[in-house]
Amino acid sequence: MLIIDSGIGGLSILDNIKKKFPHINYIYMLDNEAFPYGKKKEKFLIERSIKIINAIKKIYPIKMVIIACNTASTISLPTLKKTFSIPIIGVLPVFKPAIKITKNKIIGLIATRSTINSLYIKKTIYKYSLENTIKIIATNELAVIAEKKVRKLSISNIKLKKIFQSWIILSIKPDTIILGCTHFSFLKKEIQQIFHKPINFIDPGDTIVNKIEKYFYQKKIKKNILLCSKYNKQIKQLVFFLKKYKFKKIQEINLN
């Protein structure tokens, strides 16, 4: 199984997969050279995803790919499914669980600007906003804050409050928040503290397991591997955090 993201966000997806399937082996492609995907153009994301999959397929017997980034999934998934014969699974903002859980019918969606502006998300918001109020925050900065947190660097509570200010000032705030970026899962505690009230978080990682379960019998990779597009200081800062994922090897892969 190959998991692709530009940063550590996809590791939140991997956490959910490991809970259900603790003995699986995986390759995690941390495309840090192109971080963050949320700021990249559609053409770049499609071409980059194809390049990554082709490069890794030449080295390892991958049988399934998870695009563990909401932005890349909303943009590149249709093309990738046409290009490759192996299963390609994307991570998309999940609305149905939010509709079932919300008590006040006010749902928050926070995602990158590219995800919010995608046709898929616009159609989905229109569909579910007929009976619910959906409040939207488009931000690329929150992914950067999540990266800082896992590297044990200081993060600004003032910046977090500024990002969520449009919701904080509401007299009736969202009681359910859809996390539209895999990075945001690492900031649940900080987001919860900002609102001073219980929040239902809808995490894309909670639903990904059901999508991939039927493919695990094809597993052939014998150890866990982390590939990065550039081995640098930021990757070295992640080494301690990555220990729990039991990667046997961390190496740079040439995509040029």
UniProtKB/Swiss-Prot annotation:
Record organism: Buchnera aphidicola subsp. Schizaphis graminum (strain Sg)
Family, similarity comment: Belongs to the aspartate/glutamate racemases family.
Top enzyme category: isomerase
Pfam short name (any one): Asp_Glu_race
HAMAP family given in the database record: Glu_racemase
Tree of life domain: Bacteria
Swiss-Prot/TrEMBL keywords: Cell shape, Cell wall biogenesis/degradation, Isomerase, Peptidoglycan synthesis
Catalyzed reactions per annotation: L-glutamate = D-glutamate
GO molecular function: glutamate racemase activity
Residues of the active site: 69 (proton donor/acceptor), 181 (proton donor/acceptor)
Pathway the protein contributes to: Cell wall biogenesis; peptidoglycan biosynthesis
EC number from the UniProt entry: 5.1.1.3
Signal peptide range in chain numbering: none
Record's function text: Provides the (R)-glutamate required for cell wall biosynthesis.
Binding, substrate: 5-6, 37-38, 70-71, 182-183
Name recorded for this polypeptide: Glutamate racemase
GO biological process: cell wall organization; peptidoglycan biosynthetic process; regulation of cell shape
